[in-house]
Amino acid sequence: MKKTNNNLLLLYMIFGVSLVIANVVTGKLIDVPINLFGQHIQLPGAAVCYAITFLMTDVIGEVWGKKEANVCVRWGLISQVLATLMIIFTQKLPAVDFKMQESYDMLLGQNWIFVVGSLTAYLASQSWDVFVFHKIRDKILAKDPNNAKKRWIWNNASTMTSQIIDTVLFIGIAFGIGFGWLWDSNMHKVLLGMCIGQYLLKFILAALDTPIFYLMTRKK
């Protein structure tokens, strides 16, 4: 990918859209027909969309540098807050059709604990991702500049560790605290299953996006 402003803006756009959509669909739980601790694994609907954001910051960091990657994270946070406020504002406006309003509330209703969980997990995991990505990258390249071919190391290491932070924080806050599952011993296995299931999915997605990362960061 050429280091141009247009390409950088394109990646910012993909990052922002993926982030906002992930927050819209995060309340949906996907049932996976795999048993873990006697429970079906349940995945928040945001898992796939949100995984794209880590790929975008990694590409930005590799091509444009750490500063631009951090700028992307900060603008992403602002986008999340603005999107949430606009959804809440629109939700409060009087509706012509009551039934349509109920459908709207069901689809886009903002549970405050989900918002807190999402913002907390986002800021912590994305900041860690950028930090670790460049920490490992700089250390490996300092030994030998030709090690750029090994960029799968810092790409996967940063994403896979940051996804642990994101998964534990979001599920712990949104479902553990929000639904009160942390204080219900019967739901502990469900929480653990959600964490493990979601992380395994993110782990697989992180591994699968490696060829895309190489393609987008290759030097012609």
Predicted feature residues:
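Helix-boundary and loop/linker segments of multi-pass membrane transporters
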Residues: 4-5, 103-108, 144-149, 183-188
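Alpha-helical transmembrane segments and their cytosolic interface
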Residues: 144-157, 164-171, 176, 186-220
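Alpha-helical transmembrane segments of multi-pass membrane proteins
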Residues: 16-32
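Central hydrophobic cores of alpha-helical transmembrane segments in multi-pass inner-membrane proteins
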Residues: 48-59
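N-terminal membrane topogenic signal
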Residues: 1-14
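Membrane-helix interface motif
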Residues: 30-31, 89-97, 173-181
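Membrane-interface interhelical connector segments
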Residues: 89-113
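Transmembrane alpha-helix/helix-exit interface in multi-pass inner-membrane proteins
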Residues: 80-97, 122-130, 163
